[in-house]
């Protein structure tokens, strides 16, 4: 099975190199770009499965680079994935600093870099029309992850994302997936909805 994955990585990498070379000399169509983005996502999925494998110690880095290459082609889903990855690591580093055992200036600096990069990717995904990115950025603003905490601005982004998606009937599921199961969040969102109506 591992031999098959190695073969698949080589095959996809070869196709991506050919598409990149073609992009340098020609203006590719939308279908070609979509196909290249799909190859990046397929490669990222393979590397995600190979995390912590002794023959691929840098699989996680390769997965991130696959998403980064797809994001360079203006893919909203890739930007959203990168935003989630960087936000998760930044929150973990912030938690380490708050616990006090592993607090260092280098850790705080790296956490801030990750927060900045996460917000940049979430904003890029939001500009490309990704509803989940707008929602996650709203959650970041509500909780003060990498930015100054502002509940009003955060709730506005969450309400805008729900409006954009037209999913007012799915609010309980959306809140559960975001970790906003508290009644005060639900009442604040409903007040915002009444305010926009």
Predicted feature residues:
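Short helix-capping/linker turns of helical repeat alpha-solenoids
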Residues: 26-29, 35-36, 48-50, 55, ...
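Terminal, low-structured helical/coil segments at or just beyond the last alpha-helical repeat
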Residues: 165-197
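TPR/TPR-like (Sel1-like) alpha-helical repeat modules
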Residues: 149-166
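N-terminal alpha-helical interaction modules that lie
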Residues: 1-40, 192-196
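Hydrophobic face of amphipathic alpha-helices that form TPR/SEL1-like repeat modules
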Residues: 42-50, 81-89, 93, 100, ...
């Amino acid at each position: 099975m591992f031999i098959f994955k190695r073969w698949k990585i080589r095959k996809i990498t070869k196709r991506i190199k050919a598409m990149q070379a073609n992009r340098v000399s020609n203006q590719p169509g939308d279908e070609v770009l979509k196909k290249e983005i799909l190859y990046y996502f397929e490669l990222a999925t393979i590397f995600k499965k190979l995390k912590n494998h002794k023959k691929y110690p840098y699989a996680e880095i390769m997965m991130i680079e696959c998403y980064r290459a797809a994001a360079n082609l203006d893919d909203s889903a890739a930007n959203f994935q990168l935003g989630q990855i960087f936000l998760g690591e930044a929150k973990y580093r912030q938690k380490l600093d708050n616990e006090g055992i592993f607090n260092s200036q280098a850790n705080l600096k790296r956490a801030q870099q990750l927060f900045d990069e996460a917000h940049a990717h979430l904003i890029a995904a939001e500009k490309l029309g990704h509803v989940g990115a707008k929602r996650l950025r709203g959650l970041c603003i509500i909780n003060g992850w990498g930015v100054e905490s502002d509940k009003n601005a955060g709730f506005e982004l969450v309400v805008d994302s729900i409006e954009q998606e037209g999913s007012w009937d799915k609010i309980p599921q959306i809140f559960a997936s975001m970790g906003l199961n508290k009644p005060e969040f639900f009442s604040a969102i409903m007040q915002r909805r009444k305010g926009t109506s």
